[in-house]
Amino acid sequence: MLKLRDWGYQDIHELRDVVPSKRCSCYYADFLAERGRLGVYQDYTRLWWTGAFRGAQPWEDPPSPLPTDEHIDVYCASQAASWIRDDPGGRPFYLQVCFTGPHTPFDAPPDFRSLYKPEEVPLPILAAPDNPVSPQVAQMLKSARLDGMTETHARMMVSHYYAKVTLIDHGVGMVLDALADKGILDDTWVIYTSDHGEMLGDHRLKQKKVFYEGAARIPLIVRPPGGTSARRTKQLTDHVDICASLTEAAGAGAVGESMGRSFVTGTEVVDDDSGKRYVWSEVESYYSMARDDRYKMTVDSASRRPVELYDMLEDPCELANLVFESGHRTVRDRFLEEAFPALGFDAAKLDAFKRRLARGQYRDTFARDLLRRFN
């Protein structure tokens, strides 16, 4: 089995997601144990997990019982800042700081929660998906159990999430301060992004595993060495472009065959609004999505059968699924012919995925239902 060091990582400080336990400890668990706080945190996470399994919703998440400087996300930032300050310098470095938040639980400490009043935050898109509903979305609606969510519930959930995001922002600031204190901030590329978004009540959904904007559209903030004048771009980009950009910034060659397109030249961000024609996203090997500057289409990964089509120009809230509309046949055909072949999905990959499912590595309801469907 390949380990992180086999991929070139030299200094590894691995965390156990948000819930270190007696069976799966980590550096953060040791940190809390040294302060006599591990039991407090484990009691909290046990309470949260029990509630989640019994149907508790994110607006019910209690705040962290730990002070801010002992929260796992601040601990993560503190470790990164210490690494920066202790680094002897004189050599380039790549530092990847992976916060566990703002993933559930939405457990920001009380001082961060106090920054947001539920009655002042915006409401999510409360309209549930209308027919036709894709099998993927139907399953996640069933899993989310938000059909009884009120506006009060929604605002509470959003305010808790905003507080958690602000906690992450605090951690990012700690890392940037360390770079500045070291005198290398203006010599460093800083890229802020995420692996996925959060539905946060939009369409009566939560978390991820769908391709609505709440889950698929994520932040990307790039600061080149020395900074630059602030600007926004609407060009399409995705994670493979970040990889291509980092290797170009480092003066390295391309990483094999890649769909990535660099958005940097030298130490500058390219001022180019042309972007890519298509970007993609996938939920394992269940469903695949492609998007251009106007349309977003989802297909069943195995059969390539279209299940969702949205006109993002006319319907930015994604309320009307046009997948069966005869007037959009040419759009569907274009995506099937131009966009999805690039993903290279085939029967062999599907068979490999089915074998992984059968070994029990995917145990959530969504995966079990799909395994039954595949068989």
Cite the ranges covered by each PLM segment:
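Beta-strand elements within well-structured catalytic alpha/beta cores of enzymes
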Residues: 92-99, 161, 165-168, 172, ...
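Active-site His/acidic residue clusters
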Residues: 82-127, 142-156, 199
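Long, internal low-complexity/basic segments
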Residues: 146-156, 164, 324-375
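A long, amphipathic alpha-helix that forms part
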Residues: 71-88, 123, 146-188, 249, ...
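Catalytic-site neighborhoods of secreted/periplasmic enzymes
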Residues: 1-66
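Active-site rim elements
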Residues: 63-71, 151-163, 207, 227-237, ...
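Histidine-centered active-site microenvironments of extracellular/periplasmic hydrolases
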Residues: 105-111, 177-228, 238
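C-terminal cap/loop subdomain of S1 sulfatases and analogous C-terminal strand-loop tails that border
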Residues: 15-24, 34, 196-202, 223, ...
